[in-house]
Amino acid sequence: SETLANVSNLEARLIEQEVFAMCWSATASVAMVALGGAAVAVTAMRGEPKAIWITLGFFTVMEGLQAVGYAVVDECSNPANQSITLLSYLHIAFQPLFINAFAMAIAPSPVPKWQARRVYGLAALATGFMLLKLVPLQALGNCTPGSPLCGLQTCLFSGDWHIGWILPLNGFMEGFSSTFGIHIWFPAYFLAVFALPLWYGAWRFALFHLLIGPFLAFALTTNPNEQPAIWCLFSIGIILVSLSSFIRVRVMGAHQPA
């Protein structure tokens, strides 16, 4: 009976893994691409601010990269695998610009042009810091083994129930990662997407992003290299905010464009 119980437990775990695999697959990513494309079309035709539908399109591209990535997952020596991994990191690096553009579009009050220019400048600085992590500079050392996206090679691989990425990043700014006892491995990114929106009043959106971005990713997997890919579920939230006037106005407190 003990043997039968062990077999039953094993079968249960396998079924659970299969369910997760079915939920997170190339098919699911393709469906997200279709949903994102439809959302871009709808918001553009409705005359929404460009920042909204362009950001939707930007995150739809990430879902496309993930969908294509499934075709070469775990093939670390495959140039296509390496290229998709690099493109995925570049997408993450440029996210501060698009996230702030979106957040300013749904801020409680219109953001003055002078302030928007400074926001984009600071977001671009964060992007520059992210890109600098790719440069193999001996003076900056290597990224910390076990930290998000850190690896000895560039590869897209199978995670616990989604995909993950690793790259041979350098150790730039990792000295700030343990400030206040909290490990934040990409501090410039976090400041740009979570703190910067507070400056122009988009604190609700920043909190929303925090909950469905890193908190959701950390809750769903303990694999630090898989968490960024799951974080891209954030695109679902962007779609909801973009398409639902109730969520945008009542929940996010967005201003009404003139």
Predicted regions and their residues:
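Internal transmembrane alpha-helix with an interfacial aromatic "cap," most often the third helix
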Residues: 40, 65-78, 88-122, 130-135
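Non-cytosolic membrane-interface motifs at loop->transmembrane helix junctions
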Residues: 76-88, 229-234
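C-terminal transmembrane-bundle signature of multipass membrane proteins
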Residues: 195-258
